[in-house]
Structures are given as structure tokens and as C-alpha cells.
């Protein structure tokens, strides 16, 4: 049996519109998203990061259709804490020595005063695996995850059957990937996401 999962990046926040690094800041959605329409099939379960922008996005997408659909919050899938870079833009940081060093590392080193990239990716994957097992145990056929750009990249980079670069999995706000999970394989310890299709809900 296959479980289909739609991974969706939350709608834009004011910080996203200003191209700021927004990670641990619990921003609400931008006013411009109030009339944004994105159409995704109604899931049996929604797994969301507990941050306001993700929970609000789920409510914006499915609205009144959520009555019979539980939203499960998964703190392990919240966005990375950008430390000293939090709330800043590339323009503000481009002369910052720590930022230059971080860029040269390919974005791998820890953010000064923030979260280690490896730790961040590890917790996202842990959260994903935990929730996939939760869904399989309930024989769910279709679920949606409303999370963050960094979370989607971390999960796809680690678990997708075909190895691709971390940044290859970048998606716009409101877009994401539809993936498949083989229940049998997961039950046998082969924890992979398959058949990725990019979706925008437009």
C-alpha cells in the first residue's frame, strides 16, 4: 500500500517578502496572502510545524473543509534558528565576516548564535519519520505536511530515493512536492520518499 504525502511550504510572511532570514521568529502571514487561493486535495491528516505561519497556511488552504481533518503539530519540523542572521537580508549581511564564512561553507556551518545545520536537518528528518510512522499505523492514504522551506529541503535531501543537492529542493511559498511512501518498505526499515512531483496548487 502507498501513502501519498503533499509537502507544502507555508505562504509568505512580511519577512519573506523583504527577503529576510526568518527562522525562529514566529511571524504571521503577510496581509498580501489574505486572498491567495491554492488548491490541494483535502487530506485525511495535516501535519504542521507549530509556527503560526504554517498553521495559518493550512487554514487558508483548506478553510472550512478542515472540520473532519485533524492538525497534528510537529515541533521537530519547525524552521532553523538563524541566530545572528535572523531577520537580516543578504544586503545587510554581505560584508559580515561570519556570513561570508557561512556562504563559503555552502551553508553547512552553524549560524553564529543559532542552530547547527546538521542538527537542524537531523531533527527535521526525525520529525518526518515519526509522523510517517504515525500515518502508516493509522492506514492513512493521503496526508499533507505544512512546513518550512528549510524543512522540505532537509527531508527531501535525506530521504528521497534519488540523491540530489540540498538546494535543489528549494520551493516557493505555497508550493511543494507530492511524494509516495511504500508502507511495506517503511515497515521493513527502508525509509524512502519516492516519485516526487512538484506542485504549486495553482
PLM feature spans:
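GST superfamily/GST-like fold recognition
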Residues: 149-153
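Domain-level recognition of soluble alpha/beta enzyme cores
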Residues: 160-191
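Active-site-proximal alpha-helix that buttresses catalytic centers in soluble enzyme cores
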Residues: 3-66
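Phosphate-handling substructures
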Residues: 63-126
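Short glycine-rich phosphate-binding loop at a beta-alpha junction
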Residues: 44-50, 72, 142-146
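Acidic, His/Gly-rich catalytic cores of divalent-metal-dependent hydrolytic chemistry
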Residues: 189-202
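Glycine-rich phosphate-binding loop signature in dinucleotide/nucleotide-binding domains
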Residues: 40-42, 131-141
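Beta-strand elements within well-structured catalytic alpha/beta cores of enzymes
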Residues: 4-8, 138-147
Amino acid at each position: 500500500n502507498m501513502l501519498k504525502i503533499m509537502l507544502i511550504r507555508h505562504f509568505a510572511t512580511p519577512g519573506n517578502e523583504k527577503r529576510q532570514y526568518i527562522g525562529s521568529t514566529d511571524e504571521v502571514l503577510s496581509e498580501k496572502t489574505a486572498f491567495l487561493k491554492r488548491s490541494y486535495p483535502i487530506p485525511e491528516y495535516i501535519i504542521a510545524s507549530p509556527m503560526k505561519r504554517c498553521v495559518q497556511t493550512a487554514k487558508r488552504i483548506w478553510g472550512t473543509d478542515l472540520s473532519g481533518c485533524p492538525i497534528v503539530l510537529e515541533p521537530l519540523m519547525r524552521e532553523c534558528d538563524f541566530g545572528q542572521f535572523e531577520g537580516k537580508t543578504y544586503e545587510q549581511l554581505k560584508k559580515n565576516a561570519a556570513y561570508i564564512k557561512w556562504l563559503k561553507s555552502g551553508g553547512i556551518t552553524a549560524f553564529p548564535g543559532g542552530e547547527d545545520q546538521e542538527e537542524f536537518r537531523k531533527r527535521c528528518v526525525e520529525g518526518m519519520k515519526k509522523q510517517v510512522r504515525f500515518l502508516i499505523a493509522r492506514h492513512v492514504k493521503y496526508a499533507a505536511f505544512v512546513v518550512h522551506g528549510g524543512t522540505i529541503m532537509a527531508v527531501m535531501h535525506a530521504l528521497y530515493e534519488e540523491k540530489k543537492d540540498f538546494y535543489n529542493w528549494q520551493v516557493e511559498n505555497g508550493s511543494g512536492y507530492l511524494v509516495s511512501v511504500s508502507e511495506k518498505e517503511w515497515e521493513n526499515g527502508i525509509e524512502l520518499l519516492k516519485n516526487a512531483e512538484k506542485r504549486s496548487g495553482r
